[in-house]
């Protein structure tokens, strides 16, 4: 995958994962490893705990060490086979839930710190903390707004109308780019989801177009207006 894109001028970089489920559940993750089939990581964990005592703190430390090594390995592969593109991080959920130690590990290996943030707008204190710990520029990988007036579920952040949805898009995006370390955002998603739902039943009104490819004019106009002012908004 990496090698075939090495000279692609339209590619910014690669994400190395998405919303890892083990964040703040490292102790339980260790138990799952110990209860599971024999694997190299199980042997390494048992050896680590035997040498350092089986405590919650040591279990967390082991997972952090393993994660550090994983990120180091992945980044070396990226840099070896495609030095022209960025390591865009792991698209964590709310970075406020991530410890400063873990954020610092991310800062060692990512070119960009990425996270998904379904909220009215990214909190400045949250962005300040993430940047202070990682030292990396930041992008939001996912955010959106929806309504219930289209016969679909309202999405992860509900508004009352299509106009409100467009206003919320502008408020979120322009507030995010007002932070000097914020460099990109990805709206989720291009089209509404089918009323019958995707693989997990999710059927949100969150698109820029509906399921018959008809644009939501308010959203399109809002995106144009925001795009035209972003360089003025960005510090």
Regions found by a protein language model. Name each.
Residues 10-101:
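Polysaccharide-binding and catalytic clefts of secreted carbohydrate-active enzymes
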Residues 5-8, 107, 179:
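Alpha-helix termination/capping residues and helix-transition junctions
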Residues 1:
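Phosphate/diphosphate-binding loops
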Residues 22, 95, 121, 146, ...:
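Surface-exposed, flexible loop/turn segments at secondary-structure boundaries
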């Amino acid at each position: 995958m990496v090698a075939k894109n090495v000279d692609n001028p339209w590619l910014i970089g690669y994400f190395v994962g998405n919303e890892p489920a083990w964040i703040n559940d490292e102790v339980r993750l260790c138990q799952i490893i110990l209860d599971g089939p024999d694997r190299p990581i199980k042997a390494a964990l048992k050896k680590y705990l035997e040498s350092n005592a089986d405590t919650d703190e040591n279990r967390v430390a082991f997972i952090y060490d393993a994660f550090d090594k994983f990120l180091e390995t992945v980044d070396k592969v990226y840099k070896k086979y495609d030095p022209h593109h960025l390591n865009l991080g792991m698209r964590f959920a709310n970075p406020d839930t991530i410890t400063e130690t873990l954020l610092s590990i991310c800062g060692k290996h990512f070119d960009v710190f990425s996270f998904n943030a379904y909220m009215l707008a990214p909190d400045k204190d949250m962005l300040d903390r993430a940047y202070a710990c990682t030292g990396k520029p930041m992008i939001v990988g996912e955010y959106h707004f929806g309504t219930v007036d289209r016969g679909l579920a309202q999405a992860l952040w509900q508004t009352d109308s299509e106009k409100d949805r467009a206003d919320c898009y502008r408020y979120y995006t322009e507030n995010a780019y007002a932070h000097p370390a914020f460099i990109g955002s990805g709206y989720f998603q291009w089209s509404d989801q089918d009323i019958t739902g995707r693989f997990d039943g999710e059927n949100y009104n969150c698109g820029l177009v509906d399921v018959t490819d008809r644009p939501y004019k308010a959203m399109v106009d809002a995106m144009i207006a925001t795009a035209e002012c972003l360089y003025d908004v960005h510090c």
